[in-house]
Curated annotation (Swiss-Prot):
Its cofactor is a divalent metal cation. PANTHER family: CUT9-INTERACTING PROTEIN SCN1. A divalent metal cation 1 binds at H8, H10, E126, D262. This is Uncharacterized deoxyribonuclease YMR262W. It is an enzyme of class 3 (hydrolase). Its EC number is 3.1.21.-. It comes from the Eukaryota. Present with 125 molecules/cell in log phase SD medium. The keyword Nucleotide-binding does not apply. A divalent metal cation 2 binds at E126, H180, H207. Binds 2 divalent metal cations per subunit. Putative deoxyribonuclease. The keyword Disulfide bond does not apply.
Amino acid sequence: MNKLVDAHCHVITDPDNTFCGDDGGSQGTLRCVMSSNPYDWNNLKKLAGRSTSKNDICVGFGVHPWYSHLFYVGSRRDKVSHYQDVLEYKNEEQFDSLVQVLPEPLDLEEYIKREFNDTLVSVIGEIGLDKLFRLPANGFYMQNEKARLTTVKVKLSHQETVFRRFCRLARHTSKPISIHDVKCHGKLNDICNEELLTYHSVKICLHSYTGSKETLLGQWLKKFPPDRIFVSLSKWINFKDPEEGDALVRSLPSTCILTETDYPIDNPDPSYQKALTEQLQYLNAQIARAWDETLDASQAALRVYENFQKFIK
């Protein structure tokens, strides 16, 4: 049986540090686990250190746009001034309430200098831009805590500054990147052209890609060599409409397709782990069918595995 690939998954964001660092074992899946913020990064380090199957976990290091407001770039400012600078808001009351619960911002340069480990980290990610995300009332998104959404957003200019910094880290270390992109397809492509196009060792994974096929084929796959662009497909985004998912698969070179769950993996419950495995099996079956109805899922799984090895090396 061919090993399954989860090219983009997570651990839980846990500010209270109660995380147990248990993924229930690899479950026969090669996992590329993203970090998005300082809290899940601490948890991911624990998981990588405790894993009994270290060859099945690839570690990502990054700052997701949903958490980019937790960092400042350049000179330190007081807490209120920082959040005034990086947040976009019209409701002063909402802003004041958020500032009360948000932590003191961290120096992005110090964070990278202190935490980045070239030996441990395989991928720079998750990084990117998000035009739609609104901050929850508790200050930042946590998988296990439900909070109402405010109307406050992180300024795109700040998201871009953070994203560019991680692009430069990828250039410096020759690591691949995994990109989050919501309604910023052209902007992200422009930035990657500026920051990465001439750095041939940096590969790019467009995770759960939701842009147009025209942007994908006419920009990403036209300007970048096909061996540098990968598209990671998820069940709940790319195959929400199976026909659209099939059409996306057929439009792509078979050499650039990856599979993902985009779910936290640090829940050892067997039924939860089984559900993650079934998502990846579903994707392989859909990909195989889109290529050729005579193919079976194992053939797609083999190709995806080979693609991931090229992405990560």
